[in-house]
Amino acid sequence: MNEIVSYQPAKLPAAAAQQYQEAARRFLEHSQADNTKQAYETDWSHFLAFVQEMNLPMTGDLLKVAETVVIYITHLAESDYKVSTIERRLVAISRRYEAEGLDSPSKTLMVRQVMKGIRRELGTARQGKAPMLTKHIQRWIKTLGNDIISTRNKALILVGFAGAFRRSELVALDVQDLAFSDKGVIVTIRRSKTDQEGKGQPVGIVYGSDPTTCPVLALEAWLQAGEIRQGPVFRRIRGDRAGGKKITPDRLSDRSVADIVKDLAETVELDPALFSGHSLRSGHITQTDATEDWSMRQSRHKSLIVHRGYKRPSDLLCKKNSSGQLGL
């Protein structure tokens, strides 16, 4: 009585089978809420734009594609995205590949291990970092003295902010990368995320309207004070036996840039935990009155989607909002 009887499926008419297949597709389409599907589409578009900008492989060998995903999530982590956002984008990438009948690079050991490290370092409750704005920098500069550390830090902050530089680009600068003129300075980035071949990307920084906050004058003052004529622009400063400060030949680390930005925030009574080295770059893009075309030239973004990803909710209430241009 309790014997298991083998099951022989009945053959369905072709019309019935097709009807069930169509119903299954309909159920699949309704398996996710509209806002979830929209979020995944947005996440996929961001990933696609990044991959195209970086010229990275999306198909072929699974390990190569996994390396692409690793580079992408590392970029997100370094750009102060929340862990929850990075995880959601991995899901979006996975779903897109699996929908095409391909193995998901998001599920490879390489990607899972890197994501594990990101969670440990950033924490699952991390908030996106705040942009550093002109008003913050102006208040900070008023507190500075004329000592060598203040001179260096002022130049670092102003050049980083005006040039929309990544912290890795700032500390990699050499004197030979600077070309001064009566209009400002051309800074050549020898290698960056969007220039892996090292062809060089020129970035222009013009003289400011206020001498106390002019990035070009601050840079000139630092080079002159430090008697720096070649080699690294931004260098470590150590205490000497006489109790003074000595500029070393050693290049400043990108971690030091983050520390200086956090010190700036604390000095002007902001929460340093909300800021990072990336706050200079995001602050430039968030605040600039330049057109998107010129802003993207300065930040060296090739993708409008990636560039617009820097915009914060507060930007929705800026004076350029079209609701304020209606004469109401």
Please provide the spans of the model-predicted regions.
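Extended, non-catalytic subsegments within catalytic or DNA/protein-binding/adaptor domains
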Residues: 1-328
